[in-house]
Curated annotation (Swiss-Prot):
Belongs to the PsbN family. One of its GO terms (cellular component) is chloroplast thylakoid membrane. PANTHER family: PROTEIN PSBN. Pfam families: PsbN. The chain crosses the membrane at residues 5-27. This is Protein PsbN. It comes from Porphyra purpurea (Red seaweed). It is found in: Plastid, Chloroplast thylakoid membrane. Signal peptide: none annotated. NCBIfam families: PRK13183.1. Its main location: plastid.
Amino acid sequence: METATVLSIFISSLLLGITGYSIYTAFGPASKDLRDPFEEHEE
């Protein structure tokens, strides 16, 4: 394969991995531990 093909596949999979991890962090089981600064600062 050409270098450009390998590089584009690598960058695409890296972006997909980061997106998947951020969605899992935001909505997965670990989201219960996240703090919400807007709820802490209600008056």
